[in-house]
Amino acid sequence: MCFAGDPQIATTKLDESKSKAAPETEKVKPTYISLVKFTEKGIQNAKQTTQRLDAWAAKVQSMGVTIKQMYWTLGEYDQVCIFEAPDDETAASVLLAANMLGNIRSQTMRAFTAPEMEKILAKIP
């Protein structure tokens, strides 16, 4: 999801601020981790990958999605993207839109923080 975008869109810099604990009144958005592979089209357009990321980050920000970190990797996957979205539906919609552009294919997992995991564990009968 995090790397697709139209290279013609004006680019902006990613939010590189360090993660800080949210005030208790602020709702913490769910975190997602996407494992990304370039398609043949994505490989052909590899020189624009960072520009596409900046454009995509700006585009999805209006939907409440924040790309926290993007790593270009060696091995089975070409990228790992860590992002936050307001809910699963929003995450799914931006992932579908990114994949539809044809540069990438992704697998995405919902990630849980330690406090979220504590809440999950507390519900075990």
Regions found by a protein language model. Give the residues of each.
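Short, well-ordered beta-strand segments in beta-rich or mixed alpha/beta enzyme
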Residues: 32-37, 71-94
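Short S/T/G/P-rich N-terminal loop/turn motif that feeds into the first structured element of a domain
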Residues: 4-62, 66, 74-77, 112-125
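An amphipathic, aromatic/His-enriched active-site/gating alpha helix that lines ligand/cofactor pockets
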Residues: 85-115
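A short, amphipathic edge element
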Residues: 64-68, 103-106
